[in-house]
Amino acid sequence: MASWLSAKGKVYLPPAQPVARVLETDEYITGTSLYFHAGTERLLTVGHPYFPVKDVQDQHKVLVPKVSGSQYRVFRFYLPDPNRFALIDNGFYDSDHERLVWRLRGIEIGRGGPLGIGTTGHPLYNKFGDSENPNGYRKQSDDNRQDVSLDPKQTQMFIIGCTPAIGEHWDKAEPCASPVPQPGDCPPIELVNTYIEDGDMCDIGFGAFNFKALQQDKSSAPLDVVATMCKWPDFLKMSKDVYGDSLFFYGRREQLYARHFFVRAGAMGDALPEPFEVKTDYWIPAQEGQDQNTLGPHIYIGTPSGSLVSSESQLFNRPYWLNRAQGTNNGICWDNQLFVTLVDNTHNTNFTISVKTEAADESYKYKAGDFKQYLRHIEEFEMEFIFQLCTVPLTADVMAHLNVMNPNILDNWQLNFVPPPPSGIEDQYRFIQSRATRCPTQSPSTEKEDPYKDLSFWGVDLTERFSSELSQFSLGRRFLYQSGLINGTLKRKRTINSQAPTSIKRSAKRKRSIKQ
């Protein structure tokens, strides 16, 4: 006989209040038929590829900045306010019930210069020996560091959004109060999210890691990252952003392989399992008198290599058209700004400059110490954009949504809520600047505070570089052609081949004769 029993588990009820739904920009923003082109000048930067060169007298003064092909270049483009744009007819929209915004439709990131591979390294690299093809069982000494160089992991990447890209790296964490950590103990590590700034180092094959805080020997990483950290974009976090402002779309290409295999020198912090047992599952003890009785280090590493650089695998110097972003923000540039975060170390040639210290005559013989060697790296960029003008209705639902998402948007549109009436009488002092009265309260600043004032970006002003004549620019012509706004198809003309007339012979019909 079958009987029904009620479930003994927990009963899950829906939330008492409905979950707020985030609107997509296409639900309340309407595109117009007005398109504009904007472009930059040739953007150049020159510096030392490994470290900033500082003044000997004043260490806070930087004489030559650090410019590496493995650095992030974060461009912050300032767009003109479309509600005050002179090229837009006032009758095109209702300023009392609508506001104008820019929508990104196309972008081309130009990279100048030839392809090249730039190496990095460390003059005192923690390399005990070659662990791939060893020629003997070596013993450690007090200092086994060597002068080692390598080529970094090959990376091409760009991220487009209206807010800075979010990066991640592993950093030193605060240990627990109990048990108290002892000197030499491995510190705990944690994943940290920060904005990617201009000049931050990308991963070169050693991981997204804070080398300055977690490698105290200062010899386990190349010079360009040993005193800083490497960041990697947190694509998981940015792709799950409910508003989708930091990541409209992105392009990424990575390539590397392990070229050499080394082993670290030093005392092993984590001992091998069962080190003092007579019998262990990890090795068989060596005979007496053998070098293998003293185990060597077991911290193995591989040096990265980006390998071949080819023009067939370039992400740059080609247009990208944005029809549908991966997030809820479909290319709307809130606050009239656009962030382009990129890194490209396929154009990574480092220039070696040699200068003779003293003048030489014709009988001079070469001596290496008579020449000073310098190292410089250059970066060359040029960008073009296609923007579409869009309208935002000033309805109650839209304004409430924007106020929750970013209140600065409504402030920039000069949409202020009516303040409540004063609750009572207020105090007003005479001679407020005298010492007899209390300190005057500071008047609120009229200038808008930049939310990214403490971050470093490469600012580019595009407020005077917009043009509605798209046909006068290379990217504009390609946009017009691919979008069908102009007739770019070729009509095939029908051709008739005229040949000499041919004579057609008709056979004469015979009359039928009737015999009587």
Curated annotation (Swiss-Prot):
GO terms for biological process: endocytosis involved in viral entry into host cell; virion attachment to host cell. Residues 506-516 have a biased composition (Basic residues). Keywords: Capsid protein, Disulfide bond, Host nucleus, Host-virus interaction, Late protein, T=7 icosahedral capsid protein, Viral attachment to host cell, Viral penetration into host cytoplasm, Virion, Virus endocytosis by host, Virus entry into host cell. Residues 128-148, 496-516 are annotated as: Disordered. Self-assembles into homopentamers. The capsid has an icosahedral symmetry and consists of 72 capsomers, with each capsomer being a pentamer of L1. Interacts with the minor capsid protein L2; this interaction is necessary for viral genome encapsidation. Interacts with protein E2; this interaction enhances E2-dependent replication and transcription activation. GO terms for molecular function: structural molecule activity. Residues 139-148 have a biased composition (Basic and acidic residues). The keyword Secreted does not apply. Its main location: virion. One of its GO terms (cellular component) is host cell nucleus. This is Major capsid protein L1. Coiled coil: none annotated. It comes from Human papillomavirus 65. It comes from the Viruses. Belongs to the papillomaviridae L1 protein family. It is found in: Virion; Host nucleus. The keyword Transport does not apply. Forms an icosahedral capsid with a T=7 symmetry and a 50 nm diameter. The capsid is composed of 72 pentamers linked to each other by disulfide bonds and associated with L2 proteins. Binds to heparan sulfate proteoglycans on cell surface of basal layer keratinocytes to provide initial virion attachment. This binding mediates a conformational change in the virus capsid that facilitates efficient infection. The virion enters the host cell via endocytosis. During virus trafficking, L1 protein dissociates from the viral DNA and the genomic DNA is released to the host nucleus.
